Amino acid sequence: MSRKCDICGKGLVAGVQYSHSHRQSKRTWLPNIRKIKAVVDGTPKTIHVCTRCLRSGKVQRAV
């Protein structure tokens, strides 16, 4: 499954995680991506969308 939003382009983010003793380990944070049927250019199409774009109404779902 895609790890990138087709609407806003949000993807995974790399960084460093710190424990209580301040030891470091590299890790990635994944966006909350959903596969939905949406209307794109007047036709229903399956796209990958983050939940923030879904909630903000940037996507019109296909019925």
UniProtKB/Swiss-Prot annotation:
Gene Ontology terms: biological process: translation
Q: Name one GO molecular function term.
A: structural constituent of ribosome
Q: Name one Pfam family in it.
A: Ribosomal_L28
* Keywords from the UniProt entry: Ribonucleoprotein, Ribosomal protein
- Name one cellular component (GO) term: ribonucleoprotein complex
Q: Is Nucleus one of the keywords? A: no
The similarity comment for this entry is: Belongs to the bacterial ribosomal protein bL28 family.
This protein is called what? Large ribosomal subunit protein bL28
Q: Which organism is it from?
A: Clostridium acetobutylicum (strain ATCC 824 / DSM 792 / JCM 1419 / IAM 19013 / LMG 5710 / NBRC 13948 / NRRL B-527 / VKM B-1787 / 2291 / W)
Its gene name is rpmB
